Amino acid sequence: MKNFKIKIIILVSLLFLTACSSVKTVSKYEKKENVTWKEVEPPVILLNLEPGDIIVKEKTLNPIGMFGHAAIMKNNSIIVDYPKLGNKSYTIDVDYWLEKGRDILVLRYKDMNDEFKKRLVKNMEKYFGKNYKISSNKMNTDGFYCSQYIWYIYYITAQEMGFELDLDSDGGNFVLPYDFINSPYLEIVN
């Protein structure tokens, strides 16, 4: 009976994860056309990365990467990442995080200033170290998945400064890495 319950839970989880990939949502923002992904070849040397830059990895065919992946720059060389189920967040040098054969986009908040950047980094530290957790409530801070963490620290930083900021371009229950690409508040800088 116990094995049967485990199999059912796994089956439902797989159905949920694969079903989400084909959900059609209507973007609340204009779609960006002619997006050019930056090819990653070792050695990786990315210049001009800044705190708050969002790096989106392209989607892959495997179940872990089918939604893409995103992480955020804490400073000019260190990334904060929420990698996958069973892991907590961690920091890593961007050169070690990027992988050959998986192209990236670097997105930057258009209205970044020193005060916002300072508060954003402070919030990265405040919400760092939690377990990876998938939730349909973007405001849930018990744990995070990669793109929810990025969305939330931008959201809460803007709230602290007295304005609204929603980087999720389709406004769904989940914020996925590709949702950042069409946000009017972000620009592609690679």
Q: What does each model-found stretch correspond to?
A:
Residues 29-47:
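Mixed-charge, Lys/Arg-rich low-complexity intrinsically disordered regions
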Residues 49-109, 132-141:
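Glycine-rich catalytic cores of cysteine/serine-nucleophile enzymes that process amide/ester linkages
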Residues 103, 110-129:
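A structural motif
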Residues 17-19:
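C-terminal motif of bacterial Sec signal peptides marking the signal peptidase cleavage site
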Residues 46-53, 68, 76, 117-121, ...:
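Extracytoplasmic/secreted envelope proteins and their assembly/folding machinery
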Residues 22-28, 32-34, 137-190:
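Activation targets extended, charge/polar-rich intrinsically disordered C-terminal tails
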Residues 5-11:
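Sec-dependent signal peptide recognition
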Residues 53, 59, 83, 124-132, ...:
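Sec/Tat-exported extracytoplasmic proteins
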